[in-house]
C-alpha cells in the first residue's frame, strides 16, 4: 500500500472517531431477575420436587416424575403461602403453611405440626 493511501486511511479514521459529540453512556448490565414469591420449583432434602405455578401445587419424584401430591395454594402475604393438598400416596388431605425465609428457602409446617424446608431449584 502506498504511504499516501495509508495516511489517508488514518486521517479518515481519526476524523470519524472525533465526530462523537458526547461520551457514550455506559449502562450497568442487569443480572437475571430475582425470583419472587413461591412461583417455580423447589426441592426437599430427599430430592422430591414441588412446583408452584399459578395457584396450582404439585409434588413429584425426580427419578420417575411420579405425582405424589397435588393441590392449590394461596399467597396469604408476600412471604406466606397456604397450601391445600391431597397426598396421592396416603390418600389424605392436609393444609400446609409455608414462610419464605429467604428467596431461596421455604420453611413449611403441616396441619399436624410436622416441619420441613424446601430449597429453590435453580
Swiss-Prot record:
Cited InterPro entries: Omp10-like
GO terms under cellular component: cell outer membrane
Covalent lipid adducts (N-palmitoyl cysteine), residues: 19
Residues lipid-modified (S-diacylglycerol cysteine): 19
Top-level taxonomic group: Bacteria
Membrane topology, as annotated: Lipid-anchor
Subcellular location: Cell outer membrane
Signal peptide segment: 1-18
Coiled-coil zones: none
Record's keyword terms, sorted: Cell outer membrane, Lipoprotein, Membrane, Palmitate, Signal
Family the entry assigns: Belongs to the rhizobiaceae omp10 lipoprotein family.
Name of the molecule in the record: Outer membrane lipoprotein omp10 homolog
Organism annotation: Rhizobium meliloti (strain 1021) (Ensifer meliloti)
Amino acid at each position: 500500500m502506498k504511504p499516501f493511501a495509508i495516511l489517508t486511511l488514518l486521517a479518515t479514521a481519526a476524523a470519524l472517531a472525533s465526530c462523537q459529540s458526547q461520551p457514550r453512556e455506559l449502562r450497568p448490565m442487569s443480572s437475571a431477575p430475582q425470583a419472587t414469591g413461591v412461583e417455580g420449583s423447589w426441592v426437599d432434602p430427599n430430592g422430591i420436587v414441588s412446583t408452584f405455578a399459578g395457584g396450582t401445587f404439585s409434588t413429584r419424584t425426580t427419578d420417575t416424575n411420579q405425582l405424589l401430591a397435588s393441590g392449590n395454594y394461596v399467597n396469604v402475604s408476600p412471604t406466606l403461602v397456604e397450601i391445600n393438598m391431597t397426598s396421592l400416596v396416603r390418600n389424605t388431605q392436609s393444609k400446609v403453611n409455608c414462610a419464605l425465609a429467604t428467596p431461596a428457602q421455604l420453611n413449611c409446617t403441616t396441619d399436624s405440626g410436622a416441619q420441613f424446608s424446601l430449597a429453590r431449584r435453580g
